[in-house]
A protein has these predicted regions:
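Glycine-rich segments within core transmembrane alpha-helices of 12-TM secondary carriers
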Residues: 134-158, 171, 340-352
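Extracytoplasmic
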Residues: 7-40, 231-236, 351
Length: 396
C-alpha cells in the first residue's frame, strides 16, 4: 500500500465517520430536539415522529444513492463523494435554525441525499484500489471509523444537540476540502477512455443484465436493517425503570462495541475464506437470538444486549458490500452498490411504518417481530445456500 493509497483510505474513512456520526446524532438527540425545537413532549408522539423523520431520511438515501450512484459511474467516484459531503454539511447546519417541523424534514431529506453514497462509493473505491485481502482490512477500518463517529456522537450527547449538528456540518466541510486532492479510481479512468462509458450509470443496463445479483444482495442486507430499525423500540420497552434517553446511550455503547468486534472478525475471516457464506450463517443465528432474547433484558443488562445486536452490524455490512461490488462491471459498479445499500437502508421505511403501528401494544409487538424475524432469516438462509456468486472484478 503506497502513501497515496493510505491517504485515500483515510479520507474515505473520515467521510464514513460523519455518516455514522449523523445517524447516531439523531438517535441520541431526537428526544431533546423534538421537545425543545418543536414542542413535542409526549413520549409516544416523540417515538412516532422519530420513525417519520427516519423514513424521510431513508427516502433521501434512496434518491441520493440512485442519483449519485449514476453520477459516480458517469463522472467519477471521487467527484461524487466530494460534492455530496458538501450538500450534507450545508443542510445539516441549516437544520438547527428552523422551527417548522416540515422544513426540518426537508433539510434532513437533503442531508441524507448527500450522505447516501458515502458507504457504497467508498466500498467501490476500496475494492478498486486494493487487492482483496488488503481491501478486507480497508473495509474493516472504514466501518470501525464509522463506529467511532457513532461513539463521538454519543459522547457529545452531554452537549446541546445544536452543538452536535454544527460539529457534523463543519467536519463535513473539512472533509470536502481534503477530497479536492484525491486521485480518481484507475478502473474509472480506464472506463472513461473506453466505449463502455456510454453505458455508465445506466439503470436500464443494470436491471437488464444484473438484476439477479442486485436483488439477492439486497435481500441479504435485510436482517441488519431490520435490527437497526427495531432496536430503539426494543429499548423503549425495557426503559420503565430508567430514563429512556440514558438507556439509549448505554445501549449504543454496547452496540458500537459489538460493531467493532464484528469488523475485526470479518477482517480475519477474509484472510482465510473466499466465500462469505459461513460468516452470513453465523450472523443470521445471532440475528435470531438478538430478537428472541430481548424480553429477558433489563436495564442492568442493556449494554451486553447492545453488544449482541452490534455483532451483526459492521462485519455483516462489510461482507456483503465487498463481495457485491465485485459482481458488477465498472460502468455500473457504483450504481449497483449504492442501490443495494440504499434499498437496504430504505427498507427501514417499511419496517418503521409497521413498527410504529405495533408499538402501542408490547405483547403484539413482541409476537409480530418474532414472526417477521424468522421469515427474514429463512429467506436469507435460502439465498446464502443457493446463490452462486459470479465475480467480474477479480484481483490477486
Amino acid at each position: 500500500m503506497n502513501k497515496n493509497s493510505k491517504w485515500i483510505l483515510l479520507i474515505l474513512c473520515l467521510g464514513y465517520f460523519i455518516d455514522f456520526y449523523d445517524l447516531t446524532v439523531m438517535s441520541v438527540s431526537y428526544v431533546e430536539m423534538f421537545k425543545n425545537q418543536f414542542g413535542i413532549v409526549d413520549s409516544t408522539d416523540i417515538q412516532k415522529m422519530y420513525f417519520t423523520i427516519n423514513n424521510i431520511q431513508m427516502g433521501g438515501i434512496l434518491v441520493g444513492a440512485i442519483l449519485f450512484g449514476m453520477l459516480a459511474d458517469k463522472f467519477g467516484r471521487i467527484t461524487v463523494i466530494k460534492y455530496s459531503i458538501l450538500l450534507y454539511s450545508i443542510t445539516t447546519i441549516f437544520a438547527i435554525f428552523v422551527s417548522n417541523i416540515y422544513l426540518f424534514m426537508g433539510l434532513r431529506f437533503l442531508s441524507y441525499l448527500g450522505l447516501a453514497s458515502e458507504f457504497a462509493v467508498s466500498t467501490v473505491l476500496i475494492v478498486e484500489f486494493f487487492p482483496p485481502k488488503i481491501a478486507a482490512w480497508g473495509m474493516s477500518l472504514l466501518y470501525i471509523l464509522g463506529v467511532f463517529g457513532g461513539i463521538t456522537a454519543t459522547l457529545f450527547g452531554v452537549f446541546s444537540y445544536k452543538v452536535m449538528f454544527v460539529f457534523g456540518g463543519v467536519a463535513g466541510l473539512v472533509i470536502f476540502s481534503f477530497r479536492k486532492v484525491l486521485e480518481e479510481s484507475p478502473y474509472f479512468v480506464e472506463l472513461y477512455n473506453s466505449s463502455r462509458l456510454k453505458k455508465a450509470g445506466s439503470i436500464i443496463h443494470l436491471f437488464k443484465n444484473y438484476y439477479k445479483p442486485l436483488l439477492l444482495n439486497f435481500l441479504i442486507t435485510i436482517p441488519y436493517f431490520f435490527v437497526i430499525t427495531v432496536m430503539f423500540a426494543l429499548v423503549k420497552f425495557i426503559s420503565n425503570d430508567m430514563n429512556f434517553a440514558t438507556l439509549v446511550k448505554i445501549f449504543l455503547f454496547g452496540f458500537f462495541a459489538g460493531n467493532i468486534i464484528s469488523c475485526i472478525v470479518s477482517g480475519f475471516y477474509n484472510q482465510y475464506f473466499k466465500s462469505p457464506s459461513l460468516f452470513f450463517v453465523v450472523n443470521i443465528i445471532i440475528f435470531l437470538i438478538s430478537i428472541f432474547i430481548y424480553q429477558y433484558i433489563t436495564a442492568d443488562t442493556i449494554f451486553i444486549y447492545g453488544v449482541v445486536i452490534g455483532l451483526i452490524g459492521g462485519g455483516y455490512n462489510i461482507m456483503w458490500a465487498q463481495y457485491a461490488a465485485t459482481e458488477f462491471p465498472t460502468e455500473v459498479r457504483s450504481l449497483a452498490t449504492n442501490m443495494i445499500f440504499a434499498l437496504g437502508r430504505t427498507s427501514s421505511i417499511f419496517f418503521g411504518l409497521i413498527f410504529a403501528s405495533w408499538i402501542s401494544d408490547e405483547v403484539s409487538f413482541r409476537h409480530n417481530i418474532n414472526v417477521m424475524a424468522v421469515c427474514i432469516a429463512v429467506i436469507v438462509l435460502v439465498i446464502i445456500f443457493c446463490y452462486k456468486r459470479k465475480r467480474i472484478l477479480v484481483k490477486d
